[in-house]
Amino acid sequence: MEGARADFARPDLIRFCWAVIPSLWRPSFYLRELDRDRLICLPVMLPQTTILVTGAAGALGRVVFASLQREGYRVRGFDRLCCPWSDPMDWVTGALQSAQDCQRALQGVGIVIHLAAVPDDAPFESDLMPSNILGLHYLLEAAKESGVQRILMASTGQVVWEPLNHGPWPVRAHVASSPLSWYALTKVFAEEAGKVMARDFGMDVMMVRLGACPRSPEHAQQIGADPIARDVYFSPGDLAQFFKLAVSMPWQGFHCLNAASRPLDQERLSLGEAKDLLGYEPVDQWPDAVEAYWS
């Protein structure tokens, strides 16, 4: 058998992989070189892999959860609120601030999409600290104990507030942080925690610096009145596309990427890294499909 594999011509094997493997494994695979004459296909994610979406009842979480489920992925929601859909779902109702709830939610999970957070500036001790700091700690510890290999965590463009507002544009993800608020500082903490998980524990971690995602009609009005916010608008459709690619494409280690839709005027957040790593190509621009976030 080993000799037969060695005799399999490389071009034929590559064509075989592209033709056959996607129909067997969803959604992608690595081609890893074993020696000069052989390649082996390694699936990025088997159909049995469960993806946990935290904050799945929120505006962003609902979009990501529903999109992945429509694509045929096995998805589990984790939120303090009950499942917003009437159909039976794999759902854990619990608190991010509870280590036990995080452990329960992560049982059997292979990939985590962490969207749960207090999403705006708020009292630090009562709101931001329990959810965005302590809750993140509990989640990452539970992920480590459960053997999770890939984690995608929401950050924010607010961590680079100074260049985002004053240039030079487009702002790349490697620039030094200049957080707007205590909320943005919690996301700086999350980015550094992600580096620790990748460096010390071998996890594949992606920090996603989200553009403007309106959670209500009032929030959408604020974005519509701000030319910079309009340029970093992140539509529901592009949000779904981004996370589907981040789940399915082969990447390893730590990455920090900007994520937004097409700008109306000026590219404020560089999308080059996301295009290069994931093949992400935004389709929408402000205000395309904005109502889908809350309808």
Please name every model-derived segment:
Residues Q221, H255-L257, R262-E281:
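Conserved C-terminal active-site "lid" loop/helix of NAD(P)H-dependent oxidoreductases
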Residues P130, H166-F201, V205:
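Catalytic helix-loop patch of NAD(P)-dependent Rossmann-fold dehydrogenases
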Residues T50, W286-S295:
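Amphipathic terminal alpha-helices
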Residues V112, P123-I151:
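NAD(P)-cofactor binding segment of oxidoreductase domains
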Residues Y138-L180:
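Conserved Rossmann-fold NAD(P)-dependent oxidoreductase catalytic core, especially the SDR/UDP-sugar
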Residues L52-R70:
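N-terminal Rossmann NAD(P)H-binding glycine-rich loop of SDR-like oxidoreductase domains
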Residues A212-P217, Y233-F254:
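Alpha-helical substrate-binding/gating segment
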